């Protein structure tokens, strides 16, 4: 067994301890508030997008092509002592994760041990592949180990990106949702949403199309809520002004996904709105946009909603 497969096997071991609790009744939420730009501490005159937020809300990962990186796109991190505090200056995640190629679209597992991201580095199968890294200590943002490619069950000769791991408490399954432009529902060059199940031994099973979330247009960067009842993604499907943020929901993890709906004009704009990431608290949504009034090209924004019990 290769070192990479031994590391993948850790996923199965870790998930055994994670899929034990039972979620309560699904809460209801208000509409999303007007988004706010994360400001010049986080955003730069360059492109900043692909946000990922830690479960405790204290570490914000994202990718940027700002100066000071190792390649065309690097993953950066900003930290704060408490959720009520301002974000600190972004720091490059370092040479263990970043390379002279392009690293982007980070995503953290619910337990914080795994970092999934997209890379064009050598050793991949296609244009872009999904990689994963492990850390022992979930509060050590610079403790990531050497990443490895998820292999042909997930990656292809095409563009594969935006992994989002769902650890399903009710069914005991672990599922990796991601996007790919391999031949699917759309024509050449369009993106669909796929899912790969993690087997009990930690290995990924061959990915399959998620038809409820895919369309003849491009559907990208799924972000699955940790309880599995909502998935956010961005799309240029009919009903979008360009690239818009969309959402699909379901009552239980055993139900099919609902027909996706546009999250609306409060969040989306006539510009390019993309790369959504739903936080663990289920009330905070990060995304990127190049709408007027930003700091650079693509900027990071946040919108919030309040919770009201059924």
Give the location of each predicted region.
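Bacterial N-terminal signal peptides that target proteins for export
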Residues: 1-10
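Bacterial N-terminal signal peptides
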Residues: 9-19
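Short, conserved micro-motifs composed of acidic
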Residues: 23-310
């Amino acid at each position: 067994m290769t070192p990479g497969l031994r590391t993948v096997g850790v996923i199965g071991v870790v998930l055994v301890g994670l899929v034990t609790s039972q979620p309560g009744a699904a809460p209801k939420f208000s509409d999303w508030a007007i988004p706010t730009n994360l400001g010049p501490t986080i955003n730069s005159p360059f492109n900043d997008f692909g946000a990922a937020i830690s479960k405790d809300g204290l570490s914000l990962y994202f990718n940027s092509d700002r100066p000071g990186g190792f390649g065309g796109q690097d993953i950066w991190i900003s930290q704060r002592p408490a959720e009520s505090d301002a974000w600190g200056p972004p720091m490059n995640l370092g040479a263990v994760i970043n390379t002279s190629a392009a690293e982007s679209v980070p995503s953290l597992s619910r337990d914080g041990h795994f970092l999934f991201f997209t890379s064009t580095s050598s050793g991949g199968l296609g244009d872009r592949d999904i990689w994963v890294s492990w850390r022992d200590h979930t509060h050590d943002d610079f403790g990531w180990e050497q990443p490895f490619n998820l292999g042909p069950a997930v990656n292809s000769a095409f563009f594969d990106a935006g992994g989002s791991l769902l650890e399903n408490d009710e069914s005991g399954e672990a599922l990796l949702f991601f996007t790919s432009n391999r031949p699917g529902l759309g024509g050449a060059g369009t993106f669909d949403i796929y899912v790969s199940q993690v087997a009990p031994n930690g290995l990924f099973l061959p990915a399959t199309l998620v038809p409820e979330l895919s369309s003849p247009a491009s559907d990208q960067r799924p972000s699955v809520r940790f309880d599995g009842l909502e998935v956010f993604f961005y799309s240029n499907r009919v009903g979008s002004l360009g690239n818009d943020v969309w959402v699909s929901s379901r009552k239980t993890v055993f139900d099919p996904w609902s027909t996706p709906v546009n999250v609306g004009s409060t969040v989306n704009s006539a510009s390019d709105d993309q790369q959504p990431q739903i936080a663990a608290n289920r009330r905070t949504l990060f995304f990127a946009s190049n709408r007027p009034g930003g700091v650079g090209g693509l900027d990071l924004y946040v919108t919030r909603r309040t919770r009201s019990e059924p």
